[in-house]
Amino acid sequence: RRQRQMCIRDSIWGTAFVAQSVGSDYMGPYTFLASRSWLACAFLLGLMAVLRKMGKTNPAAEPGFWQNKKVLLRGGIFCGVALFAASAAQQMGIGTTSTAKAGFMTALYVVLVPVAGVFLGSRPGVKLWCCVAASVVGLYLLCLAGRDTLSLTGGEWQLLVCAILFTAQIMLVNHFSPQLDGIQLSFVQFFVVSVLSTIFAFVFEAPSPDQFRACLLYT
């Protein structure tokens, strides 16, 4: 079941690069990020209500609709800030480079996460490192081989920063998620992303209602 869920997630993640690339031609990165994040919040809020009625919550969390409120707030803010920074860097990078290169460089967190884990005290086994190496080779063959060259220009640097920030976000989620309901943590972090990206959009860009409507189609 978990393998199927990961395959579905990766399919959505991969196809989103095309939508992000097209969307970057019509609106700024913060406007695009704000639109898709508010849409994610609305979806997750409805999903939380449905799952609550079905009784599917994290048994490790305390009772009540909003479970482990203090940890949820703290975790949501930390994860949300990291997700905002990573997503903004990704959207900026996608606007200046190819989607294939963006996919490869963003996915470098596959390498960075176990490396970060070593510094935090975990000891990945040989099997994991072999899987990491195979993943990087596979990503290169899928995204870049015979199609593009890898060079660190402006957009590529932004995508490298994006991979580092996604690594931090994954490590934060890994820290907080055992204590919380996963859907609620996702909602709070996307709410943080929505608020921050909306503020940045109005400060650094000139968003319009038409741009928000168009972005909903892309996301």
Question: Can you name each region flagged by the protein language model?
Answer:
Residues 2, 26-30, 34, 68-72, ...:
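Juxtamembrane helix-entry segments on the extracytoplasmic side of multipass membrane proteins
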Residues 15-27, 32-35, 39, 87-97, ...:
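Juxtamembrane C-cap of transmembrane helices in multi-pass membrane transport proteins
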Residues 12, 16-17, 51-106, 139-141:
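Specific transmembrane alpha-helical segments of multi-pass solute transporters/efflux pumps
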Residues 30, 41-44, 113-114, 119, ...:
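Transmembrane alpha-helical segments that form core, pore/gating elements
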Residues 44, 124-145, 163-166, 197:
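Hydrophobic transmembrane alpha-helices of multi-pass small-molecule transport proteins
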Residues 4-8:
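Short, small-residue-biased leader/transition segments that mark boundaries at the very start
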Residues 43-48, 109-130:
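C-terminal transmembrane-helix exit sites in multi-pass transporters
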Residues 72-76, 124-135, 156, 181-189:
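Cytoplasmic-side transmembrane-helix entry/capping segments in multi-pass membrane proteins
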